[in-house]
Amino acid sequence: MSLTQDQKVEIIKQFGTSEKDTGKSEVQVALYTRRISDLTSHLQEHPKDKHSRRGLLMLVAKRKKILNYLKNVDIERYRKVIGELELRK
């Protein structure tokens, strides 16, 4: 359910500039997206797990805030992240 260290490092390498670049908005959005997809698959198997559903909604809200920030600061980086993660059509 949670991300392993290897999975995190792989995502950070893909979206960050270095292996320790975890603060970049693109990296944060990618990590949240991976956690959201994991929680979504968990909730499909366990539909009555209300605590995980709340956690999912909180993660979606955090990702949305970061995406709004990124859209206001640098629209090109925003479009690139949206395209790579296939978040919007």
From Swiss-Prot:
Could you mention a single GO BP entry for this protein?
Answer: translation
A Gene Ontology molecular function term for this protein is: structural constituent of ribosome
Specify whether Oxidoreductase is a keyword of the entry: no
Q: Which SMART domains match?
A: Ribosomal_S15
Among Pfam families, the record links this protein to:
Ribosomal_S15 (PF00312)
Is-annotated flag, keyword Calcium?
A: no
Q: Which GO terms describe its cellular component?
A: cytosolic small ribosomal subunit
Which cysteines are cross-linked by disulfides? none
Q: Which InterPro entries match?
A: Ribosomal_uS15 (IPR000589), Ribosomal_uS15_bac-type (IPR005290), uS15_NS1_RNA-bd_sf (IPR009068)
Q: Which UniProt keywords apply?
A: Ribonucleoprotein, Ribosomal protein, RNA-binding, rRNA-binding
The record's PANTHER family line, in alphabetical order, gives: RIBOSOMAL PROTEIN S15, BACTERIAL AND ORGANELLAR (PTHR23321), SMALL RIBOSOMAL SUBUNIT PROTEIN US15M (PTHR23321:SF26)
- Subunit details: Part of the 30S ribosomal subunit. Forms a bridge to the 50S subunit in the 70S ribosome, contacting the 23S rRNA.
Job of this protein = One of the primary rRNA binding proteins, it binds directly to 16S rRNA where it helps nucleate assembly of the platform of the 30S subunit by binding and bridging several RNA helices of the 16S rRNA.
Q: Indicate the family of this protein.
A: Belongs to the universal ribosomal protein uS15 family.
What name does the UniProt record give this protein?
Small ribosomal subunit protein uS15
